[in-house]
Amino acid sequence: MDSEKILNPRLVSINSTSRKGMSVELPQKPPPPPSLLDRFKALLNQREDEFGGGEEVLPPSMDEIVQLYEVVLGELTFNSKPIITDLTIIAGEQREHGEGIANAICTRILEAPVEQKLPSLYLLDSIVKNIGRDYGRYFSSRLPEVFCLAYRQAHPSLHPSMRHLFGTWSSVFPPPVLRKIDMQLQLSSAANQSSVGASEPSQPTRGIHVNPKYLRRLEPSAAENNLRGINSSARVYGQNSLGGYNDFEDQLESPSSLSSTPDGFTRRSNDGANPSNQAFNYGMGRATSRDDEHMEWRRKENLGQGNDHERPRALIDAYGVDTSKHVTINKPIRDMNGMHSKMVTPWQNTEEEEFDWEDMSPTLDRSRAGEFLRSSVPALGSVRARPRVGNTSDFHLDSDIKNGVSHQLRENWSLSQNYPHTSNRVDTRAGKDLKVLASSVGLVSSNSEFGAPPFDSIQDVNSRFGRALPDGTWPHLSARGPNSLPVPSAHLHHLANPGNAMSNRLQGKPLYRPENQVSQSHLNDMTQQNQMLVNYLPSSSAMAPRPMQSLLTHVSHGYPPHGSTIRPSLSIQGGEAMHPLSSGVLSQIGASNQPPGGAFSGLIGSLMAQGLISLNNQPAGQGPLGLEFDADMLKIRNESAISALYGDLPRQCTTCGLRFKCQEEHSKHMDWHVTKNRMSKNHKQNPSRKWFVSASMWLSGAEALGAEAVPGFLPTEPTTEKKDDEDMAVPADEDQTSCALCGEPFEDFYSDETEEWMYKGAVYMNAPEESTTDMDKSQLGPIVHAKCRPESNGGDMEEGSQRKKMRS
């Protein structure tokens, strides 16, 4: 009986050698359910046992393999990454029976329910991209029929995912097959319509974290990829394919399993590869081959601006994601900041990530996912070099996004000091040009405020500004990181038209309050420097003019102008003078190789593309009215004030006259009125005093003596108010629903004042005259109608009874 006892599970961890004398056997933990790969092997072993008996067992035929594969294929009833992984491995091991397996998968897609078609298509996609070879030819014969039927039967919410899946097949299936599908389903036109209709890109689906012990990264080095390049890529039907996915049989080495069990499934490797990288990693993270990056540059030149043609392994991350809840909206490919597509490279998918880089930067979210400008990497925040274990020739950057503008700028400055070999490229990073432009307008108060290098170093950095910019274009604003300084459109208006009146205005009125005085010479220098910068702007600017003194006036009063966005960290604090752009830096910019007009044209064009500048002519806003009283100023009609008080608040309360801007605020206000009116109606208030007093009362009141500051005009004898029985109420009691005297039920109602249910016209029988708040319920007696209470209980009914009215 001792062997049948159930012990505490904590004892399982005790070493068995420490309990030799114990006769109790600990219960064993049930083994996990076998995977599909193990089940398939078990079915093969069962077949061998059935045909055993000492004779040589013949290898299974194609029909038998297909029959066993259909058994495990029936488990793919939902979008599961482990199931797709095992089915892909089985298909890779049984490549000699690939034609039958492909037909079984196509039949499964045609006959499966609607909700199970997309997981089967993902299985087809995984087999073609990871194994390739003959499977592409087997599936091509039935792909138009299978995909078109599944697309027509699928729910409309799954159509974007299926179009995205179709867009990744440009390198694994023949073009005639894809054109046939496109003609039948009109996928190109549907993708363009969805791209135009989507104002904002949808939130990208998150990848599924995989335990690193299941990952073996066998990524070839960059030098080896350059050598085999196109030779290993040209595989499928005379068109260039991505190397490393269709040459599955050419680079077989030691077998390994994704589930860490020896299953015989081979994996591609390379002698000089780093063990921390992987090439065959379908659906298990975000690793891609270097061939993807190489082919991505070339394919973007030929495939236009649609989202229908993506790299073959771009959809691997979708396996195991519920596409009915996460629908990807196809969006047009926009090269980052208008720069050439060869300058961008999909780098973020080369390592396993537990978050999406698109979530961290709005610029990345608006641009092509998986692409990034190399020149803007150091501006993303804290960037530190991480040495690699194997091949150390490649320099990888591990970027961690930090919060706060000042902290990011300090990290960038420390990077330029710690890594001298990258400091030559820092001067062209996005954000430096914006800092130069912003400082000329007066947005940056001091460099030490953000932990930036001294202003002399900025001049040294910008001395190479002209020759560092490629093709004579100014770095675009969308290439900046989170630490760059935005330039609002209102400030560009000030730069475009400073006006001649600014000098006169500066001579007449100070820029700051008296406690924050700035020297007149400093203001004049800043005016001259701003005028020098305006000379570089194109004369044919279509922006609406806005005077410079408008910005200066708003700053002098301590608030930003309407329509402009000035960060709080960039505001002028405690009398710190604005640091204008020195004339030396302007001369260095003017002496650069690039044409000045083209540089600022590119900057303005980028601002217009990002929506920061509009071509619509905006009316010039009026200046502040000031704080000094002037009778003549009151006679002038101020349209801005009238609009702010009336025009901008179209909704008005008919009861009290208050105005509101939106319907929600107006509705809340009306609800408040209804509550107040209901409370006033239920609670009858007495007047504070009588209207008039007689002459005798007036005279007697004037001669009255006492400590009161004002004589009392009302009679001194107390007057008892006549109260109605209907005004009395007590809280409802579930234990007593009828009068204790007459037996009739009480009339209950909900009181808005007390926010509880009350009995109307009811009182406590034994309630005293004083307050009953601290008294026990048993002392008050039963609840009775006020009209039923006997008058003999304590004298007169109105005087001797405590009538509980509705509490306010």
Curated annotation (Swiss-Prot):
Zinc finger (C2H2-type): 651-673
Keywords assigned: Cytoplasm, Flowering, Metal-binding, mRNA processing, Nucleus, Zinc, Zinc-finger
PANTHER family linked to this entry: POLYADENYLATION AND CLEAVAGE FACTOR HOMOLOG 4, PRE-MRNA CLEAVAGE COMPLEX II
InterPro entries, A to Z: CID_dom, ENTH_VHS, PCF11-like, Pcf11_CID, PCFS4-like, Znf_C2H2_type
Protein name, as recorded: Polyadenylation and cleavage factor homolog 4
Knocked-out gene: effects: Delayed flowering mediated by FLC under both long-day and short-day conditions, but normal response to vernalization treatment. Abnormal alternative polyadenylation-dependent FCA expression profile of the known transcripts. Global differentially processed (DPG) and differentially expressed (DEG) stress-associated genes due to alternative polyadenylation, splicing or transcription initiation.
Places the protein is found: Nucleus; Cytoplasm
Record's GO cellular component terms: cytoplasm; nucleus
Any one biological process term the GO annotation gives: mRNA 3'-end processing
Quaternary state and interactors: Homodimer. Forms a complex with cleavage and polyadenylation specificity factor (CPSF) subunits CPSF30, CLPS3 and PCFS1.
Compositional bias (Polar residues): 196-205, 253-263, 271-280
Nucleotidyltransferase in keyword set: no
